Amino acid sequence: MDIAHDLQSIGAQEQALVFPHFDPARAWALGNRMHALAASRGHAVAIDIATFGHPLFFSALPGATPDNADWVRRKRNVVAHFRRSSYAIGLRMQQAGTTLTDKHGLPLAEYAPHGGAFPLTVAGAGVIGSVTVSGLPQRLDHEFVVETLCAELGQDYGVLALARS
């Protein structure tokens, strides 16, 4: 895995995956799409869609644990703080050889710079929340979110997917 290349690719994902509008009905549709895909693949994940301070969708598939819900919360906090995907922030910390605590004073009990939380961006409004998955290895959590956002927004996942590691 080339961190610099992944960071560039994640930046392209964040630029491309923008909703023209977003409301609770769209959150429900996206959440159900994610749930159905995760169930079809046998993924034991927790799925969360929220605007900042307002939960819109949550689902825990069979095999997901309360730990997954806590990871969701901590990853979501990273997006809320940085307005970037949690995976991008984690890779930036890895690249710099530091941690969120050392660099930004953010406690790891509240912030998880691991893949799986992606900014929910609306054209003309910016980042309004996050779409988060927890239960797979972090790169796969991130890519699962990107794949389903691509499907929801009519984007070509093959173009936006991270390089295979």
From Swiss-Prot:
Signal peptide feature range: none
NCBIfam families assigned: PRK02487.1-4 (NF002695), PRK02487.1-5 (NF002696)
Record SUPFAM superfamilies: GlcG-like
Family: Belongs to the UPF0303 family.
Organism domain of life: Bacteria
Protein name, per record: UPF0303 protein Bmul_1674/BMULJ_01570
Database matches in InterPro entries: PduO/GlcC-like (IPR005624), PduO/GlcC-like_sf (IPR038084), YBR137W-like (IPR010371)
